[in-house]
Amino acid sequence: MLDLYGVWRHVLLRAGIGTGKDFLAEAETYRCAGRYDRAAQALALHLTLRPGDSAAWLQLGLVQQAANASVDAEASLRKSIQIAPAVTASRIALARLLHDSGRPFCALAQYRQALLSDSNFVLDAEDVERAGPRFLDKLQNGAKYDGRIYCDISDLLAYLRENVRATGIQRVELCVIADWFRSFRHDDMIFVFCRDGQSQIYRIDDELLAALIDATSRANASVEAYRLLLTVIERESTPISLEKGDVFFILGAFWIGIDYVQTLIDLKSRGIFVGVYIYDLIPVTHSQFVPTTALQLVLGRFADILMGADFICTISDFVAREVREVLDRQFGKSIPVSSVLLAHDPPASGDGKIEPEFIDQLPPEFVLCVCTLEARKNHTLLLDVWTQLYARHGERTPVLVLVGKWGWGIEAFRQKIEEMNFLSGKIVVLGNLSDAKVDYLYRHCLFTVFPSFVEGWGLPVGESLACGKPCIASNASSLPEVGGSLVRYIDPHDCAAAAKIIEKPLMDRADLAAWTAQIVREFRPRTWNDVTDVLLDTVKSSAVAGRNSERSLDVLFAPARVYQFGSAPVQVGAGVAATLSGWEQRQNRFALRSGWHGAEDWGCWSSRPVANVEFKTELPAGTEISVLAMVRPSPPSKTGTVVLRDVAGECATTAKISAAKPAWIALKTQVGAEGKIELQIQRVDTSYRQAEPRRALFVGLSAVVYTAIEQLPALRNQIEATSLEAIG
């Protein structure tokens, strides 16, 4: 804020007095004298006359920072960048300010942009120290892919709207993104998100993403702070168009929120490679550990991704083997499946600040278990083991500290420990802890336990070892890959045997000390930098290899069979040995080639006036056929005029259809070359209004059926004998 002196000067300027004065020289004089407030006033006067002077905005930001007016300084530096984005000096000044104000990832985003805008720019020692020792490692030898990798994190954005602390998949995403910022990599990796019901992809600004990573790293992180940033990200992110040779890679939980089918179809039809990081196949192989209310949706999304992906990365060799088996048995499909193993890094300590009250409440000795409290994690075994230990050793039994939020299928366990008064205080449950607190618990426990029935990897096992602490883990699924010979293993189904293994280091402290020393001496952790490097290299190599492979989108439809496009039910509970009947129908949606939103229960809405459908038949080319499509106009119109057209043969039929219920529209045409049938469905009336503000809706398609001309009467009888509800 200007004082009376500054106000008086502005008044004179507006009156035309002093416009020829050299305010820059005056500002420099004040700056050299250490009078930063007056220097800022002089620069502000100069900018009143020349608001487009980027260098002056930079100088104003610097003197404001010297005057401890950080908020004003940041605004001035951003104004300088807005005017001249290619000038690195302003970005470097802003990076320093952001770093010194506790926003290290925002600072890294600015350093990154400075290097991208000027390939000859060299960071000085001060900035290298701020950016960190690994930031420039890949500047010279970073391998560029001749396309771009678009990394989808839609699930992470949705997750952070409801959760303060990321665990599991979302923690992996945050660690990969954070490492991507910490090491300068060329501009071939772009983070994006999708909106449900739309096939459009949106680019996330690097600095907005960095601000989100900064927010998640703070000890006082809050959902409210996340939501403010997420709202800005969703508002400011711009739609982008991917090009042939690019890669669309889904980094997170693809079954949360987003129906990717139309996005995958659109991308693959334009020569874009689709990859996905699969963390486990638990919904497929161990469906008892998935909430029944979500199981059908989750299994359907797994089917869509497995059918649509060109290549797959997995977080363990165990998951890779499962994925290959499911692809072969369920789909008769073979695509590249590569293991990109996760890290052993401990949780980031954030600012390292821990309230003394937290430390004071901890027991002097404790065993630690870090994971969501849910049925799959097998906390019931731990309760039974600690009950046995307490019965034998009484108060000598160390406390079991469970760290994690309450999840699904754990109600009986929760009720039991509450009724037992948490085993007379020998079990403690802590939730919503900062990374610094979790790190403290790891480093001060006796050892950790992780008895899970099934995992895709097992982050807590690696975190324990990385903190120099022994771990007793389940011998199931991927867990032996994480800890190797340094971990002691238990059968998650054998409580009696597990109790003996857990009791040994508790009662034999010499054994525990020797085990701990062995881990400190021998363990070599895999870092998130290693993971990110391998992941990017694998994605690039998979895309390069895919250029020479067959990537057909063709869907085979048989005559006289109704193919529906709604969210089809899938077979539940049969695991890998399930028949194709459940997932087979979901392949129908891959016939919806362009111009479609995601599937709903009844079918799909077209996203533009003309939408395409394409499938193959085993009938010879030139065979005369009738194609019937069940369609409906979009609300709120009462009627709509719809055209069904054969793209290859230029045959068309037009019908006026009531919006009250779907109706069949028929087209006589011929099978095209290579057995293809290519259709267009078009809404041609122009008087309709849109019912939804965020989606354009035109025609709804529920089903398609075709038959040879001579079989049309029989097909009509079949349709008439079947209610619309049954086939729609």
Task: Show where each model-derived region lies.
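Helix-start (N-cap) detector for alpha-helical repeat units in TPR-like alpha-solenoids
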Residues: G20, S54-A55, T88-A89, V122
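Carbohydrate transferase catalytic cores enriched for Leloir-type hexosyltransferases
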Residues: D22-E28, C32, L62, A66, ...
